[in-house]
């Protein structure tokens, strides 16, 4: 199964794609109306527009540094996951998405990095909580949000994960507890982006790591993960042969492969791959 991730509604109807994800809100904060013909996708706690309009929404670390694009390693502005009004707005948007199409994908779920958020609200809620451990409290915040979102989605719920499968890293970084999220999530999506895909050994390592992290066997022909995961590849201006190779590697370990933000290039790769299979060829580097 091949899918597309797009901001352009007409591309969701291309026949080459078995599945389409349509960005209702991306990290810029730009909103679009949900559509019925695709899986609507919401960037949850990445929102440049909201952060720019209301700096009080932005998480801070223990030294008072804000989680914005002005800092190293931050590609967009973040919103604190404990801000009640913002969360309620997100949940309303998720409900609207589910009304158009009963399957929804959540993107950018979690705290921005380790040591976030240390705003007064987070500090007070941690102090008043049942938790003695800061990491466990952060996990509870994110799990509660995903649980609330799942109640508003009658169909399948997809959740995007930061591409780091190593034990404990998702928890330390974002407050993501995979085991706690499994009852609410039907499928995880892992973006493994590169501008060229000139090599794929790293892609295989990460894909296999997520297979293990989600409860699957290390062996490809062993047991599947407890919750399935798919891999999203970056298709913009990537050489078609390289994109095909990356898709074949990803497809070995993941349930499905999705292509991001270049429908024409993704379509070309799918058509080439289908033609090679019909000719009885096995794709490989020449």
Regions found by a protein language model. Give the residues of each.
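Catalytic domains of carbohydrate-active enzymes, especially glycoside hydrolases
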Residues: 1-34, 96-103, 181-187, 250-257
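Aromatic-lined carbohydrate-recognition surfaces of secreted/lumenal glycan-active proteins
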Residues: 2-8, 135-175, 218-239, 259-262
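Substrate-binding cleft/loops of secretory-pathway carbohydrate-active enzymes
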Residues: 15, 156-197, 246-250
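The substrate-binding groove and active-site-proximal loops of carbohydrate-active enzymes
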Residues: 19-22, 72-91, 133-140, 191-196, ...
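Active-site-adjacent "subsite" loops/lids of carbohydrate-active enzymes
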Residues: 40-95
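An active-site-proximal structural segment forming one wall of the substrate-binding cleft
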Residues: 78-110, 152, 177-181
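Active-site-proximal loop/short-helix segments
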Residues: 103-133
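Substrate-binding cleft of secreted/luminal carbohydrate-active enzymes
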Residues: 192-199, 221, 227-286
């Amino acid at each position: 199964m091949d899918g597309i991730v797009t901001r352009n509604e007409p591309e969701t109807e291309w026949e080459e794609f078995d599945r389409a994800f349509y960005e209702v809100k991306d990290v810029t904060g730009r909103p679009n109306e949900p559509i019925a013909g695709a899986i609507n996708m919401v960037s949850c706690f990445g929102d440049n527009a909201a952060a720019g309009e209301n700096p009080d929404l932005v998480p801070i670390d223990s030294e008072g540094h804000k989680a914005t694009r002005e800092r190293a390693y931050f590609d967009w502005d973040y919103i604190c996951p404990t801000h009640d009004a913002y969360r309620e707005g997100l949940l309303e948007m998720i409900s609207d998405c589910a009304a158009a199409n009963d399957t929804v994908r959540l993107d950018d779920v979690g705290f921005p990095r380790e040591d976030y958020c240390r705003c007064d609200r987070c500090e007070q809620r941690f102090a008043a909580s049942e938790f003695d451990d800061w990491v466990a409290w952060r996990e509870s915040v994110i799990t509660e949000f995903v649980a609330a979102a799942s109640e508003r989605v009658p169909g399948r719920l997809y959740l995007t994960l930061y591409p780091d499968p190593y034990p404990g890293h998702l928890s330390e970084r974002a407050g993501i507890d995979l085991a706690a999220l499994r009852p609410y999530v039907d499928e995880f999506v892992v973006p493994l982006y590169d501008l060229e895909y000139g090599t794929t050994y790293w892609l295989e390592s990460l894909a296999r790591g997520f297979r293990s992290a989600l409860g699957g066997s290390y062996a490809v022909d062993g047991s599947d993960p407890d919750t399935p995961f798919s891999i999203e590849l970056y298709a913009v201006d990537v050489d078609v042969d390289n994109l095909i190779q990356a898709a074949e590697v990803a497809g070995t370990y993941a349930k499905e492969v999705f292509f991001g933000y270049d429908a024409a290039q993704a379509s070309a790769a799918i058509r080439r791959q289908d033609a090679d299979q019909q000719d009885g060829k096995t794709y490989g580097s020449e």
